[in-house]
Amino acid sequence: MPWIQLKLNTTGNQAESLGDVLVESGAVSVTFQDTHDNPVFEPLPGETRLWGDTDVIGLYDAETDMADVVAMLECHPQIGKGFIHKIEQLEDKDWEREWMDNFHPMRFGERLWICPSWRDVPDPTAVNVMLDPGLAFGTGTHPTTALCLQWLDSLDLNGKTLIDFGCGSGILAIAALKLGAARAIGIDIDPQAIQASRDNAQRNGVSERLELYLAKDQPAELSADVVVANILAGPLRELAPLISVLPTTGGHLGLSGVLATQAAGVAQAYEDKFILDPVAEKEEWCRITGIKK
């Protein structure tokens, strides 16, 4: 069915409350979009971060009387009369099919493929991880996830243990297990991430070799041959004392979620305990790897 879209512009600190107003006016969904197409990066836990100049977009049923909606919004104290807005009719599409068509199998390194479940596996003899795109967690499309997957593909993981610190969808831990790791441990602060990792591990037949913990419940004195943390530069610096003790002597460390401009600051937090490799970059993002001294 066709839809009607109403777009308003506001500041980032007012966007969420304005979105609530659109829901009150009958919007079936509300999304936020940067007016200037600048990226917004994942906030720290408990923090909501939006752009300074934000478009708030409400989606309405095609039968909605938008004149009534506008009149209601003009009476709202946060908006008022004469507010600037844009209304347009969206063509009727099979949105689910169009969304699915955007995702294809992706290759990382020499052996590893990440494949949506509705696509044919390009190479049945390769290492294939079946993973469907979701709303919150990594699927390989982001440069930082790609950098980590390429790195894992380059390692000899046979018989090794891996810790995925900030596991999200579990994509890195699952890929490591499919690449030969004997055991993987996923840690995250978000219960939804733990559930997503569990579901994806089950789908890929590796759930018996994957242990999952909320960060507050992780066992003391964990260690592994390989540790990967694809989170953000701030947490990587703050958590360096905790992350640095996880790899065994001679073990591998891989860090990402870091902008290239932040690499030096993150590397400095780890250089005392690791022999660091040259930084690898993809687009504006980077990966820092090293060996535990």
Curated annotation (Swiss-Prot):
Enzyme class: transferase
Reactions catalysed, as given in the entry: L-lysyl-[protein] + 3 S-adenosyl-L-methionine = N(6),N(6),N(6)-trimethyl-L-lysyl-[protein] + 3 S-adenosyl-L-homocysteine + 3 H(+)
Pfam families per UniProt: PrmA
Keyword terms of this UniProt record: Cytoplasm, Methyltransferase, S-adenosyl-L-methionine, Transferase
GO cellular component, one term: cytosol
Entries under SUPFAM superfamilies matching the protein: S-adenosyl-L-methionine-dependent methyltransferases
Location(s), subcellular: Cytoplasm
Enzyme Commission number(s) from the entry: 2.1.1.-
Cited Gene3D superfamilies: Vaccinia Virus protein VP39 (3.40.50.150)
GO biological process terms, semicolon-separated: methylation
Residues binding S-adenosyl-L-methionine: 145, 166, 188, 230
InterPro entries for the chain: Ribosomal_L11_MeTrfase_PrmA, Ribosomal_PrmA_MeTrfase, SAM-dependent_MTases_sf
GO MF terms, alphabetically ordered: protein-lysine N-methyltransferase activity
HAMAP family in the cross-refs: Methyltr_PrmA
Family designation: Belongs to the methyltransferase superfamily. PrmA family.
Function according to Swiss-Prot or TrEMBL: Methylates ribosomal protein L11.
Protein name, entry field: Ribosomal protein L11 methyltransferase
Organism, scientific name: Yersinia pestis
